[in-house]
Amino acid sequence: MFHILRLESTVDLSEPLKDNGIIVFQSDKLDLEPSPNLGPTGIDNTNVNLINAKGDVLLHIGIRRRENAFVFNSIPYGESRGPEERIPLEGTFGDRRDPSITVFDHPDRYQIMIDYKTVYYYKKRLEGRCEKVSYKINEGQTPPFSDVLGVTVLYFANVMPRAN
């Protein structure tokens, strides 16, 4: 299933993500220069999120160019975020013309891929199936991606070759 996800928006998936589901966020541009305006937060941050029916952010993937970091976290609805997990941003994107972030939903963790190369495994902290995705940016900043992302939902069983 394909969805259009605009900057500063949240989109309901056609159905909750099932076991071994894959979500691919695709852009048609990549700008890794830090945003010149840090806005009121003081943090250069653009993020995509996987959200359950209760509003919990199951997986937050933040791109902080000024800090040269990907930030991973979970945020229970109405509560504080947990401890951040980080990896370096530099060198992760291979193709600046068609960048992608892919999330493979395993039973106990999320496998995060940048341009289809695994960069991190994030252990699940919250329960529930992903039912929504969002694309956000801190106020007054410029995003590293296009203003509109393509979001594709796939299932491993459907993309794996089968012998007849």
UniProtKB/Swiss-Prot annotation:
Residues spanning the signal sequence: none
Molecular-function annotations in GO: carbohydrate binding
Domain of life: Eukaryota
Pfam family, one: Gal-bind_lectin
InterPro entries noted in UniProt: ConA-like_dom_sf, Galectin_CRD
Binding annotation for a carbohydrate: 60, 64, 73, 84
Coiled coil regions in record: none
UniProt-annotated location(s): Secreted, Extracellular space, Extracellular matrix; Secreted, Cell wall
Entries under Gene3D superfamilies matching the protein: 2.60.120.200
Domain Galectin: start-end pairs: 9-154
SUPFAM superfamilies according to UniProt: Concanavalin A-like lectins/glucanases
Keywords carried by this UniProt record: Cell wall, Extracellular matrix, Fruiting body, Lectin, Secreted
Induction (free text): Induced during fruiting body formation.
Entry's Gene Ontology cellular component terms: extracellular region
Function: Binds lactose. May play a role in fruiting body formation.
Assembly and interaction partners: Homotetramer. Oligomerization is required for carbohydrate binding.
Protein name: Galectin-3
Gene that this sequence comes from: Cgl3
